[in-house]
Amino acid sequence: MATEKGHGRDDEERVPLTRGSTEFRNSIDSFDYSSSTASLSLAVIDRINNSTQDAALGEKGPRDDDDDRYWDDDVEYDVEDADYIPSGGKPMHKSVKIALWTLLFLSLGGWSLAFVLFIFRSHDTYETPISSEDNISSGGLRGDRITLDDVLGEEWMPRHHFISWFPGPNGEDGLLLEKDGLGSTGYLRVEDIVSRKDTKSSKGSIVLMQKNTFTVGGETVICSQVWPSPDLKTVLVLSEKKQNWRHSFTGKYWLFDVDTQTGQPLDPAAQDQRIQLASWSPQSDAVVFTRDNNMFLRKLSSKEVTTITSDGGVDLFYGVPDWVYEEEVFSGNSATWWAHDGNYIAFLRTNESAVPEYPVQYFVSRPSGEDPNLGEENYPEVREIKYPKAGAPNPIVDLQFYDVRKGEIFSVDVADRFPDDYRLIIEVLWASNGKILVRETNRESDILIIAAIDVLSRTGKIVRKEDINALDGGWVEPTQSTRFIPADPSNGRPEDGYIDTVIHEGRDQLAYFTPLDNPKPLILTKGPSEIVNSPSGVDLKRGLVYFVVAGNEPWERHVYSVKFDGTALQPVTNVSESSYYDVSFSDGAGYALLNFQGPKVPWQKVISTPANENPFEEIIEQNNHLSRKLRLFSLESKVFQYINIDGFSLPVLERRPPNFDPTKKYPVLFYLYGGPGSQTVDKKFRVDFQSYVASTLGYIVVTVDGRGTGYIGRKSRSIVRGKLGHYEARDQIEVAKKWAAKPYVDESRMAIWGWSYGGFMTLKTIEEDGGRTFQYGMAVAPVTDWRYYDSIYAERYMHTPQHNPQGYDSSAISNTTALANNVRFLVMHGTADDNVHIQNTLTLLDKLDLANVDNYDVHVFPDSNHNINFHNAHKIVYTRLADWLVNAFNGQWLKTNNPTPNDSLFRRAATWAGLSI
């Protein structure tokens, strides 16, 4: 469940400005994958929530100017043109027009009066949204209200520029890649960040590609993504990109020569075959790539392609992850790593022969693009995915090496490693002189080992081992953020080392291990704040590490630096303000793209880091369009606070309608995600679905980061292990009870909703509550039984079903009697969800049928995946949520045993309609 991931928070989950689309690709794409991300992704919701995770994927919004100097990912818009109906026939006589208009107004008036009488005579009245006139003083000048279309579109998205920092061929710092879609100054350029501030100067600018198209043998190639070689002489080009899963894709690859501005196929003998992955050698003299799950090497000195592996196929993957490793471990599409000297390539060999398949059916579309066989046109297309569910056989992974000079593959045995079927390889990091660090865990992700391998001597040993389960009952989150620190005796570093995140005094902190085989680190950070997916940048010359921390409060983010010896801890951002920052650093950490993400209107600036002797600052985005909109619209107010439940201090965000009146009674909607290590209560600026509910519908929205979530200490996080949903549901219910007791809350109108893991939590909460506090629930793409979810995620937090059968039983949504005690609940799911299979929803429906429970609604979206966006589905999801919620708080879903027709109401409506009955 990766990144609203997921569903993520992905999403709606992210990679620094074009990282993944333009950066020097010499290893796995670097993702700022926080320890919080479950692959029950926060990705879908994040698109609605306008959330930018870490320094990676940001949201884009309307532009204020024509400044195209900073690179943005392409934005696709769905444009639906209204049907144009031409007029025809003779002009209508004026008197006839007048008569018709008079009749129309009289009819409309009568219907309007009847409607008003009907509403006021009905007992099902509800809190009317506060009028815009009453809200002028607390919001914009006009007090306008946002619409659902506003929050689903680009209207309120902060514009976010991505900068793809590039390591200079000669050690230059502060170089960046730029792409200009108009091609006025070249399509792809490398520029010095300092000299580029002077737009009249071309100093430091190198044009790599004049245009985004070129011709090869009469075929026009249109760039989808580009990766310059480290020496800037050749560009690796991807065209005809086709998405596979969340992170993976295929396409045609080309080599574009910068000097001649001409291109050639990466594999001249098979230029029409689609490739899964390609990456540059650090020396710019070769490209390794994977096609049909086999690996190949193309040296630029020749047009010949060398076959590295030949037995890859459906069950055997080389250099690329399978579905579960892509989703839950690497959050990316690469399992290939070049050594710094270019002499060796490390790669994963993934054997899926024992992994069961899950069929994903497509009833409307044919994603394969292939025509069905004759006579099979009316059958759904089925895609079989190797998907290991909890307790099922996992893929067996081995780290192998390719000696580029000798052309041979070899493996290195390490004593006392986990058995093949009980091992997860979660990170690979090259050091120097042929040494490589491999991070592994056991299947349940609670014992960590670090193995150091020497590929020159072909020997290896375990240099560090940690039993996380014994330490605090927790688990190991896979990250790709460990940083190698090379030896530099002149700068006080006699040995190689690495910076890693460790558990120290109940928090995630930074630690420096040196030499590589030293298991005892120097702790770099301490205190109550937790490190966020760090380090973010390393300045080797000045001996500094930069990192992001959840500041004085868990809903904040601030940037700090500290020396390699743990001294001179300094803030980079203004820690006196309660703010949320994100950052990406240049290769040498002399410069940074600083992203202010809230609570006020986001802005971005490129700065020199404090240790840089040459001060520099350039504002590149202020989001003036949002500042202007805020002056016109009335939005919700936000109240951040802590609520103590069972001795744990939980972050809570309350969104109040404009012109909040404490003497009124408001309905309340709880919105949650709640996955292990995740965070939903933060100070990012966002105008999302929750904003619409509070600002326009006039309801209070409450979000609680309960036990199990991130950045409030490992004690509260680890407690949920083995019993997902138990403590988290209790926290939601106990906080809801406190809100129900508030004088401004209508305790008879309380609902809860979530997507993905949040969908699971919605159902678990209303199951545990049994209608005593919440009356309504809305669950989108929910897990209903962790046995149905993928093994790596589920077992990380629940152990295996064989180890913890009782925990799986109690976590499953199964108490149909309790669900029946709620007034009503809604479940929505996509049929082609490859992440949270619709099996979850269908088995729940079967339980409800067997128990004769019918107080629920279901909406199934054909061919939609976990994001639910096929054929207008994304808009329908949120429209359905909003309408269903209004009906609920209107009292339209009141339970009635043995309902009978209301004849008097029917006759009254028929009379108003002019019907004779």
UniProtKB/Swiss-Prot annotation:
Sugar-modified residues: 135, 351, 574, 815, 902
This enzyme's EC code(s): 3.4.14.5
Ranges of Basic and acidic residues composition bias in the record: 1-16
GO biological processes: proteolysis
A GO cellular component entry from the record: plasma membrane
Keywords: Aminopeptidase, Glycoprotein, Hydrolase, Membrane, Protease, Serine protease, Signal-anchor, Transmembrane, Transmembrane helix, Vacuole
Family listed: Belongs to the peptidase S9B family.
Protein name, per record: Probable dipeptidyl-aminopeptidase B
Native species: Ajellomyces capsulatus (strain H143)
Gene name, Swiss-Prot/TrEMBL: DAPB
